[in-house]
């Protein structure tokens, strides 16, 4: 079994989801959201995200990590802050020795619901289909689980291609 953490980075809320995969099977382990205090300065908020994610990685001991890529919007300040939160989301698992993969939002949706553009409710429904025991509160945790599933599908495809080349 390979344990994967998916991370949906955000300065206010960073979602995380842990799954295990073996072949085509997926198993829900845990999910949640790390929040930062909007009344604190940026550095302190980033520390809150770092410490919260480090605790999750330490507690659940994933083998690999996947983080959603950011999109650039018209608000440059918001994009920069999201980029800083994303840096934390990549740094924490990397410092724990995990390989960190990155996926575009449309690749995540395609892996979970079959198309690159879809509604949050479609993702929630498919998470329950793929992992009936999955529990998630809010979009951030659901998105993080979807990111982990996307990585599980992609790592399986890569492993299959490597096996075909070797054999």
From Swiss-Prot:
Database matches in CDD domains: RuvC (cd16962)
Free-text cofactor note: Binds 2 Mg(2+) ion per subunit.
Reaction catalysis annotation: Endonucleolytic cleavage at a junction such as a reciprocal single-stranded crossover between two homologous DNA duplexes (Holliday junction)
Major localisation: cytoplasm
Compartments reported by the entry: Cytoplasm
Binding positions (Mg(2+) 1): 8, 140
GO biological process, one term: DNA recombination
Cofactor(s) this protein requires: Mg(2+)
Major enzyme class: hydrolase
Enzyme Commission number, as recorded: 3.1.21.10
Catalytic residues (UniProt): 8, 68, 140
Keywords in alphabetical order: Cytoplasm, DNA damage, DNA recombination, DNA repair, DNA-binding, Endonuclease, Hydrolase, Magnesium, Metal-binding, Nuclease
Domain of life the protein comes from: Bacteria
Subunit structure: Homodimer which binds Holliday junction (HJ) DNA. The HJ becomes 2-fold symmetrical on binding to RuvC with unstacked arms; it has a different conformation from HJ DNA in complex with RuvA. In the full resolvosome a probable DNA-RuvA(4)-RuvB(12)-RuvC(2) complex forms which resolves the HJ.
HAMAP family referenced in this protein's UniProt entry, alphabetically: RuvC
Similarity field: Belongs to the RuvC family.
Primary role: The RuvA-RuvB-RuvC complex processes Holliday junction (HJ) DNA during genetic recombination and DNA repair. Endonuclease that resolves HJ intermediates. Cleaves cruciform DNA by making single-stranded nicks across the HJ at symmetrical positions within the homologous arms, yielding a 5'-phosphate and a 3'-hydroxyl group; requires a central core of homology in the junction. The consensus cleavage sequence is 5'-(A/T)TT(C/G)-3'. Cleavage occurs on the 3'-side of the TT dinucleotide at the point of strand exchange.
Protein name per the record: Crossover junction endodeoxyribonuclease RuvC
Gene source species: Sinorhizobium medicae (strain WSM419)
